[in-house]
Amino acid sequence: MRAAVFVCLLLGWVGVATPRRLRGPQADRLAITLYYEALCPYCMEFVTTQLNPSMVRQDRLPFTDLTLVPYGNARTNDDGNVECQHGVMECELNAWHACILEHHDIAQSLKLIACMMRGKKNRLEKCADHYQIDVGDVKNCKKTRQVNDILRKYGKETAKVSFQGVPAVALDNVYNADLSANLTDHFDAIFCAKYKEKFNKQLNNCQ
C-alpha cells in the first residue's frame, strides 16, 4: 500500500493535527487522527484491514484517542461547494460518515464506518442492523442539512495538515509523511511501539 497510496494524491509536508475528541485520561491514550475519504480504495483497505482490526480485535481503542476526518482530497470552491476526488457519491458518503461521527461515540462510529467501507454503496442500514445501532439521528442529520454544511468543519480540520495522499495518519497529533506511509502498512505494530515509547507500557498482544 505504501507505493499505491499516492493514487489518492495531494501535496505533502509535515504538519500538526488537532484532536477533536478526547476519550478519558490523555496520559493513557495515544492520539491517532485519520484523514480519509469514503471511496478511496486505499482508505477502504486501511480502515477495514489495518485500523479496525487493531482497534477492535486487538482492543487498542480503549488506549487510543481516535479522530476520524472524512474529507481527504476534497476541495471547497469559492462558492462554498465541496468537490470530492471520487465524485458526488463520495461527498454524499463522506457526509454520512460525518453525521455518524457527530451523533455517536467513536466506538460505534468506527463499527459503522468500517462496515460501510467494505462496499462502495451506502450500507448504513445494513451495518446499523448488523450492530443493532439506532441511526435515526444520523438519518436526520443527513436529511436536514446540506452536504457542504456537514463537511465544512472537516474541510477546515483537513486544511491544517497537508499530506501526500490518503489515507493520512497523524500520530500523537503530528503528521509525518514517512511515518504515515508505514502506519498504513503496519498500523498495529507501530501503534504498539509508539504507545510503549510514550507511556512505558506494554499492551496485550503486542510483540
Curated annotation (Swiss-Prot):
Entry's EC annotation: 1.8.-.-
Keyword annotations: Disulfide bond, Glycoprotein, Immunity, Oxidoreductase, Redox-active center, Secreted, Signal
Leader sequence residues: 1-19
Disruption outcome: RNAi-mediated knockdown in the fat body or hemocyte of flies infected with the Gram-negative bacterium E.coli results in an increase in bacterial load 24 hours after infection.
Pfam families per UniProt: GILT
Glycosylation sites per record: N182
Gene Ontology CC: extracellular region
Family under the similarity heading: Belongs to the GILT family.
Protein name, UniProt field: GILT-like protein 2
Organism of provenance: Drosophila melanogaster (Fruit fly)
Upper lineage: Eukaryota, Metazoa, Ecdysozoa, Arthropoda, Hexapoda
Designated gene of the protein: GILT2
